[in-house]
Amino acid sequence: QEQTREFQKENETLKIQRFENTFFNMLSQFQEVVNNISYSYQDKEIDKIVSIRGREAFYVSFEMAPRRPGISSWNPEYENRPYQGMSEVISVLGKEVYMDAFTPSYFDHYFRLLYRILKFVKTSPLIAEFDAEYEYTSMLRAILSRYELVWIYYNGLSEYGEEKLQPLLERYAM
């Protein structure tokens, strides 16, 4: 009986190690995706194309990069006006415009991988308790910058994320 108990304990340890190996590999891949994000835009003040990489792309594209929403259903007065970053587009036109306002496709892979990590934690049979799920997703949340969280928030509210991503974001208080 003692031997059976030891075997079960060892088996549980191996399951957790297998889960953690996959989870931390996914986090590593996520970090690689973040580091490889690149974004370029024309800065009219210095008359130069500015290229941004990594986490800085989240900040620049939200606060600084010029945007033209191109939303035909909106008031034409706003249609062709340049905006200073997605934050200004949202503050002038509302969060509903996120989908139409040139949502950056260079974040697509980022959002898909984020979703896969959260879904992996939620659906893994190797983790039985919510507290353990929450602990792992807290590790993920800890590596996200403020502007990543802002983009994740709006993506979760959009038609891209409302059905699948948003429930996971709420579940893990992200």
Question: What is each stretch, according to the model?
Answer:
Residues 1-15:
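Membrane-aqueous junction of the first/signal-anchor transmembrane helix
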Residues 12-174:
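Intrinsically disordered, low-complexity polar regions and short flexible loop motifs
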